[in-house]
Amino acid sequence: MREHRYSIELPHTAERLWALMQDYDRWSEYAPMVLAVEVLNAGDTAGNGLLRRVIYRLPFGRRGAALELVTEVEAARGYRYTMISREPGNDQSGSVRLEPLGGNRTRLHFEERYHLTSAPWRWFEGPIYRFINRQNELSMRRLSDWLGQHPEYRADLVEPAT
């Protein structure tokens, strides 16, 4: 099993980051691999049990899709997810956590665990996930960049300057 952890400090409130993270129609605007997100089941009022299909780019113009089950949702603080594989044993899991730092700053923590069991994918697990990890980190940076380029987006969630 492999694990990837990434943390970054971002110049936005946790609430504003959360709002954009929950705005699935916009994921393709900042996440380089994401083409679309389809919400298949909205889950409960907090978002627990949300089931989403993430459609993403693959090399050579191909497309892939991942089913993600979202749990342990705490609004503006984080959630856990499980990527449900077609084959038993290939599920992946991860979490996103937002740590408010005050002054319109938040530390975003991202982690993901994966273990490919099927040939030929398991032979290429290292290179595959190095690529995916770089794309995930880029998505987190571009999430912040997108908010910086769109100051009008949920401006009500920006802390007033003191």
Could you say what each language-model-derived stretch is?
Residues 1-44, 161-162:
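Hydrophobic ligand-binding cavity/cleft-lining segments
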Residues 7-9, 38, 55, 69, ...:
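Generic structural detector for well-ordered beta-strands
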Residues 28-29, 57-107, 113-115, 145-149, ...:
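Hydrophobic-ligand binding "helix-grip"
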Residues 114-162:
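A conserved amphipathic terminal alpha-helix motif
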